[in-house]
Amino acid sequence: MNQTENTISMEKLNHVRFRALPCSHDFCITCGLCSSACPASGIDGFDPRTLVRMAGLGLENEIINARWPWICTMCGKCEHLCPMDIRIPDLVRSIRGLREKNKIPGILQKGLEAALKTGNNLGLPKEDFIYIVEDVAGEIAEEPGFEDFKVPIDKKGANLLSTIHNKLVNTHTEDLKYWWKIFHAAKEDWTITSENWEGTSWGLFTGDDEAVKIMAGRIMEQMKRLEIKNLLWPE
């Protein structure tokens, strides 16, 4: 066979790398249901079916360096429709985890590094966090029926610990009120923690399993410190 610039050398294929991923990508029958269900299909030529086939062929460098895995929203619609039960979101996450950290696009890696260093993706100091949540609590207390409302911080022995999405203390503070009003109306014994309160684990989206373990472990440490048995993770 004559080689062209598009010919793929067998030496470039790494079947072992992707065969080890628990995604059963080699079961693909190329039916295209994943592509028809994908909300991101067609963006920059993205096609989940092609992504699965690339993994099946062992196109390691091509798939790791491609933009496609980062276009995926990981919503899971493709997996839901796949007749072969191929776990495409798991495959995408595994592929993302193979990319060098300094080449991860957008703010994902920077936010993750901030979270590992400070306990939240914003790098928000403890004092600023407390000021923001107490200010939101003060606004709630101005509403009829919530005059006695206060946000419980580091309440030992509470029934429920609620984590917080970083955007709720940044650009969407109004959304905090909905949760807290429900707690108040239900007479729930709840609290938030002043440290490691971050409820968003960006390692989930970058494929960084070690970072996910660290973030989850910190939440567990807070639960042990405050002697709390129940966790609400709104994210």
Regions found by a protein language model. Name each.
Residues 25, 42, 55-233:
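Iron-sulfur-cluster electron-transfer modules
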